Regions:
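N-terminal subdomain of lithium-sensitive/metallo-dependent phosphomonoesterases centered on the IMPase/IPPase/PAP
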Residues: 1-103
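Acidic beta-strand-loop-alpha-helix segment within the catalytic core
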Residues: 3-6, 11-15, 121-168
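A short, compositionally biased
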Residues: 44, 116, 144-148
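Generic secondary-structure boundary/loop-capping signal
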Residues: 45, 54-55, 79, 113, ...
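Generic structural "secondary-structure junction" signal
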Residues: 47-50, 59-60, 84, 92, ...
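Short beta-turn/strand-loop junction motif enriched in small, turn-promoting residues
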Residues: 87, 104-105, 138, 155
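Glycine-rich active-site/cofactor-binding loop and its immediate structural neighborhood
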Residues: 94-136
């Protein structure tokens, strides 16, 4: 079986399996902290603004969750750059980089629909390495990394062995 894009990126970044385990733990903690902050604001928004494009919203919950996530990432991984949806990029952008969407599904959130998430990913260059997605209303955390697997909470996800869509 050929090496996955994520596995190759992890190798090129010089990350050991224990590094990946630690970083996926950081991603999970950050996603969980962001999701908890979103739930504190759910149904109690004090600010909803249009970011410029029609239908592209930002709320006080987006901003509050992003602040908490960025603080946690800076404390636990100060040498890793960040690209965050609301505040933009910080740090060297060609190595390891956290990609943060503090409120994925802002429109749903703003309308009181419970289908929203906090998404945290780690990339090396343009290649994905690992990710964690907290769906706080459903109390679910999806996460995964090469060599570790993909999970919902702590239950392994089963993926198809089919490699081509037309064969599925």
């Amino acid at each position: 079986m050929p090496e996955s894009i994520c596995s190759r990126a992890a190798r090129e970044a010089g990350l050991s399996p224990s590094d990946l385990e630690r970083l996926v733990g950081v991603a999970r903690s950050a996603a969980d902290a962001g999701g908890q902050e979103l739930m504190r604001h759910y149904g109690r928004l004090s600010s909803i603004k249009n970011k410029g494009r029609s239908g592209d919203l930002v709320t006080n919950a987006d901003l509050a969750a992003e602040r908490i996530i960025l603080k946690l990432l800076a404390e636990q991984t100060p040498d890793i750059a960040v690209l965050a949806e609301e505040s933009g990029a910080a740090g060297q952008q060609d190595g390891l980089r956290w990609c943060v969407d503090p409120l994925d599904g802002t429109t749903n959130f703003a309308h009181g629909y419970p289908f929203f998430a906090t998404s945290i990913g780690l990339t090396f260059g343009q290649q994905p390495l690992l990710g964690a997605i907290a769906v706080p209303f459903l109390k679910e955390m999806y996460w995964g990394a090469p060599g570790i697997g993909a999970f919902c909470n702590d239950s392994p996800l089963q993926v198809s062995s089919c490699e081509r869509l037309e064969d599925s």
